[in-house]
Amino acid sequence: MEEQQNEALEQRQNCCCLTGHRSLPSDPDRLAELRQNLRRLICDLAQQDITTFYTGGALGFDTMAAMMVLELKSRLPQLRLHLALPYPEQAKRWSRTDRLLYEQIKEHADRVYLVSMEYSAVCMKKRNYFMVDRSRACAYYMVNATRSGTAQTVNYARNQGCKLFDLLEKQPERFVKTPQQQQISWSEQVIVRESYPTAQEKSDPEK
């Protein structure tokens, strides 16, 4: 048992979870900046031997982050993409195009985890905590710092001692140590759009 715990701790040292909202910036410049910050951070973390990245497989930021890791693997082959899926039929109500992309990401991921075998009110939360529990660091895209699943995940990661990286900062390497540092005072002014909204996603507060 102790050997397994030590192995899990060692694996955690090489992992970072990526979390964010389903809604991405509608402003092309803000979206480009987010992508640039994410790309730079993944490359920087790889130099620190953090090479395994967890994403939750949802639409919006999760999809963008997963595709970024897969894109960078062409020149950083040590990178690994781990998908933590909340339940088997997550993509059932998505559009055909989104489902095809989802299946392609699953096919190219290094590992795929099913956190729950069926949908429940807490399956998204379980998925988020699953990723944090296996990560040394947590990089996040968050414009709602109070009422969102992303905020809940970031707070849990902070309590677990993860290094936090705010992808909206100009220097995403900044380690967020306190809730005061993490707050984004101008967040409510950022224009966002609902990416591929469905009735289920609109009612789901987990992202």
PLM features: residue spans?
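Intrinsic disorder/low-complexity segments, especially N-terminal tails and targeting/processing regions
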Residues: 186, 192-194
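Long, low-complexity, intrinsically disordered segments
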Residues: 194-207
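Acidic/glycine-enriched connector segments
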Residues: 2-187
